[in-house]
């Protein structure tokens, strides 16, 4: 299944917000899976200098990755397919 990178804004002074968003992302992915669309939350990467947080999901399509991000309340700036090392086509 492809992986998708969800880019979001996260202010430097937003202590604890990343953990809350990760919990919502995990819950939204679980909910979509129960509804029949297999989605998995893979983790996040925070870049405090740029005030960006990237969330990664395994999902069938860009549309599904965007939907899980929306359900999690992540307010994505963009959603793009990402290919982890070792999985190049």
What are these regions (language model features)?
Residues 36-38, 73:
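Glycine-centered loop/turn motif at secondary-structure junctions
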Residues 23, 27, 43, 67, ...:
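Charged/polar, solvent-exposed surface patches and flexible loops
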Residues 4-8, 42-64:
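Short, well-ordered beta-strand segments in beta-rich or mixed alpha/beta enzyme
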Residues 59-85:
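An amphipathic, aromatic/His-enriched active-site/gating alpha helix that lines ligand/cofactor pockets
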Residues 38-44, 78:
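A short linear hydrophobic-aromatic micro-motif
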Residues 5, 10, 20, 52, ...:
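Generic detector of leucine side chains in alpha-helical contexts
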Residues 1-34, 47, 85-89:
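Short S/T/G/P-rich N-terminal loop/turn motif that feeds into the first structured element of a domain
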């Amino acid at each position: 299944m492809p992986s998708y990178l969800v880019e979001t804004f996260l202010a430097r002074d937003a202590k604890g917000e990343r953990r809350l968003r990760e919990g919502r992302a995990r819950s939204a992915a679980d909910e979509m899976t129960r509804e029949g669309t297999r989605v998995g939350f893979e983790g996040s990467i925070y870049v405090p200098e740029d005030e960006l947080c990237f969330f990664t999901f395994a999902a069938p399509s860009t549309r599904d990755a965007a939907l899980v991000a929306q359900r999690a309340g992540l307010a994505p700036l963009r959603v793009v397919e990402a290919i982890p090392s070792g999985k190049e086509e």
